[in-house]
Regions:
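A short structural micro-motif
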Residues: 49-50, 77-81, 126, 182, ...
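Extended, basic/helix-rich recognition subdomains
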Residues: 147, 183-184
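Active-site-proximal alpha-helical scaffolds that flank and shape metal-associated catalytic sites
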Residues: 4-14, 70-175, 222
């Protein structure tokens, strides 16, 4: 067994001690491999809003723990960074940006019908309103659940989808596969930089809200 897999299994074991770990498993067990191009595009749209709340949660964590060097190092890998650059029509060589900005630009690569876009934007905006009503500490410690195996498992599930044709989905897949790489590094991975925040079930509503927007965008994931 690889070091990366051992680390992922350990993180999964820790998360399953809490109810939010079951929600992560539920998300991973959705029918990702059957999702078509339209469904994947919808997921990319609502994931953009998740990436906004992730960035905000990291900013909250940094404000609560301004002297935490590990969180500072994590921050350097998520905000104002060139670690997703270059990517055609999204990021120039060496260009620094927040990761949610990469996703925002990604959505511009393929036009969707106006009514469909309004529906997806409404799902995302409602989600952000819900998340922003939650307490700051829960939002801060959620970072550890995302970075220390949670999102890596979700991303590995998403990339089992078969149809990634088109510039938007190619950019989204680049985002996902690079984040798998960032999070799985056994020594300097993003999970190693924040697991000391020790999440518990105070973050359960955040994971439930994430699952809800994925299913809202692509209800066929559950059928």
């Amino acid at each position: 067994m690889s070091i990366e897999q051992t680390q992922l299994d350990t993180a999964h074991k820790a998360s399953t001690e809490f109810s939010y770990g079951k929600v992560i498993d539920d998300i991973c067990n959705l029918k990702w491999s059957h999702l078509d191009r339209e469904g994947l595009t919808n997921v990319a749209w609502v994931y953009y809003y998740f990436s906004v709340q992730f960035r905000e949660n990291l900013e909250i964590a940094r404000s609560l723990y301004p002297d935490d060097d590990r969180l500072l190092q994590l921050d350097h890998g998520e905000r104002d960074t060139n670690n997703l650059s270059p990517w055609p029509r999204v990021a120039a060589t060496g260009e620094k940006m927040n990761h949610d900005e990469f996703m925002r630009r990604t959505l511009k690569l393929t036009t969707v019908a106006a009514e469909r876009q309004r529906r997806l934007e409404e799902i995302g905006k409602t989600y952000l309103t819900k998340v922003r009503s939650m307490d700051r500490m829960s939002r801060a410690v959620s970072i550890a659940s995302y970075e220390d195996g949670g999102l890596e498992n979700v991303f590995r599930a998403i990339v089992t989808a078969q149809d990634w044709d088109g510039p938007l989905l190619q950019a989204f897949k680049h985002f996902l596969t690079e984040h798998i790489r960032f999070d799985s590094d056994p020594e300097q991975g993003h999970g190693a930089l924040c697991r000391h925040l020790t999440p518990n079930d105070r973050i359960l509503p955040l994971w439930i809200a994430f699952k809800e927007i994925l299913l809202g965008a692509a209800p066929e994931l559950a059928t």
